[in-house]
Amino acid sequence: MADQLIIFDTTLRDGEQSPGASMNKDEKLRIARQLERLKVDVIEAGFAASSNGDFEAVQGIARAIKDSTICSLSRANDRDISRAAEALKGANRSRIHTFIATSALHMEKKLRMTPDQVFEQAKLAVRFARNLVADVEFSPEDAYRSDEDFLCRVIEAAINEGATTINVPDTVGYAIPELYGTFIKTLRERVPNSDKAIWSVHCHNDLGMAVANSLAGVKIGGARQVECTINGLGERAGNCSLEEVVMAVKTRRDYFGLDVDIETQHILAASRMVSQITGFVVQPNKAIVGANAFAHAAGIHQDGVLKARDTYEIMRAEDVGWSANKIVLSKVSGRNAFKQRLQDLGAQMESESDVNAAFARFKELADRKSEIFDEDILALVGSESVAREKEQYSFVSLSQHSETGERPQASIVFTADGKEVKSSSDGDGPVDASLKAIEAQVKSGAEMVLYSVNAISGSTESQGEVTVRLQHGGRVVNGVGADPDIIVASAKAYLSALSKLHSKADRVAAQG
């Protein structure tokens, strides 16, 4: 029988550390539910001690999710660990993930602690956490750049104190696959009690090798847990990509000899949801979930695939949630057909009221578009106006006038705390005029640091998905809006970003 590989998803914690990727607690819960549908083994729901908002998010996820272990990160101190345990009280299965840096650079420059002090603090932290929960994970931060002898001492002590998982981070993405795999193997051989814990890998993508390093840690090193994120989301160049690791292990089971429990047909819906909520667009050539992942342009390749799929395809697109049926619904489609299509796409809603709300928006869209594509459906149900807590600002209507040689004019109606607001402005273009009209009333003072438009499907009547990133007072937030009218989509995205900007709580920095 093959060994089991544990999938530990940290999209909601490490993934959220990407500048602009902050999520509110309702958005985190939606992603957590999708991760549960994927059958992710462990969901790191956040860093409970970092802010009241993160505490509430971890607490809400712990109470709602039944099939996955829910984990909270904590620094190696009693306050953080107690806060994590408190947030996790309602979970069916809970884990505290505590960490402290062990590299000479981090100990000296960041912690200003001696190795002996770090050693003692690591021991005490694991001991304290183990008295609160049965499942404790310990991470020596920046492990790959740590002194090997010292690292072995710390890990041995952590296991003696009750750590059930030892995670070995390549915090800055410095590792090379063969060397990292050998590093994990050496640690497991040198630590006397290594067989008492599950070994885990956590790799960053600074040199583009997070997935390769993680797989080497599994194959060469014998790790049996991989820490990863949907779409490889994470600070700097990102984290190990969940979808790539899972499909590599499943597709090359002959090589890895491992099983994973992930329900892969829900991968695309998870990717789309994370992209839509965070505003981080998936590149077209991204493995597994990119728009071109299963596309063949060369004539010889197309001919081969038509004759036999396995000539150029090593996976079936349907296995990760893609559908060969591009035009799926129209304005005459009923609610049952719509609900079935959601299920086919792995995009189930949380309740019947959410289905009704999504169906109403689908009918509105169908009145404006003759053909509704899978991508339209995923954008629609992933939009922030479905199944989320009420936003401070929401779009109502917009009109604009533009003629060659004249400055465009825009008039917009939106709600602010439930009250309708009307505003008009001119601008350098219709989008500029619309956003200036909003700003004239809101007066946020925020700086726009990103504006991007992505066509959801390939036709001229495609919905445009707009991402707006705002920065103010050290805060960076994303807003996303989708609509066949790019100007309307832009206004929706801007209002969404403003709502996040005004509700985001301050938080402290966490481990990489």
From Swiss-Prot:
State its cofactor.
Answer: Mn(2+)
Please give the chief subcellular localization of this protein: cytoplasm
The highest taxon in the source lineage is Bacteria
Question: InterPro entries given for it?
Answer: 2-IPM_HCS-like, 2-isopropylmalate_synth_dimer, AIPM/Hcit_synth_CS, Aldolase_TIM, LeuA/HCS_post-cat, LeuA_allosteric_dom_sf, LeuA_bact_synth, PYR_CT
Q: Where is the Pyruvate carboxyltransferase domain?
A: 5-268
Chain spans, region Regulatory domain: 394-512
Q: Where does Mn(2+) bind?
A: D14, H202, H204, N239
Q: What is its EC number?
A: 2.3.3.13
Per the record, what are the reactions this protein catalyses?
3-methyl-2-oxobutanoate + acetyl-CoA + H2O = (2S)-2-isopropylmalate + CoA + H(+)
Write the record's keywords in alphabetical order, separated by commas: Amino-acid biosynthesis, Branched-chain amino acid biosynthesis, Cytoplasm, Leucine biosynthesis, Manganese, Metal-binding, Transferase
- Example of a GO cellular component annotation carried by this entry: cytosol
Q: Which GO terms describe its biological process?
A: L-leucine biosynthetic process
Give GO MF terms, alphabetically.
2-isopropylmalate synthase activity; acetyl-CoA C-acetyltransferase activity; manganese ion binding
Localization of this protein: Cytoplasm
Q: Give the metabolic or biological pathway.
A: Amino-acid biosynthesis; L-leucine biosynthesis; L-leucine from 3-methyl-2-oxobutanoate: step 1/4
Known role: Catalyzes the condensation of the acetyl group of acetyl-CoA with 3-methyl-2-oxobutanoate (2-ketoisovalerate) to form 3-carboxy-3-hydroxy-4-methylpentanoate (2-isopropylmalate).
- What NCBIfam families does this protein map onto? leuA_bact, PRK00915.1-3, PRK00915.1-4
Give the similarity note. Belongs to the alpha-IPM synthase/homocitrate synthase family. LeuA type 1 subfamily.
Q: How does it assemble?
A: Homodimer.
Q: What is this protein called?
A: 2-isopropylmalate synthase
The species this protein was found in: Albidiferax ferrireducens (strain ATCC BAA-621 / DSM 15236 / T118)
Lineage of the organism: Bacteria, Pseudomonadati, Pseudomonadota, Betaproteobacteria, Burkholderiales
Q: Which gene encodes it?
A: leuA
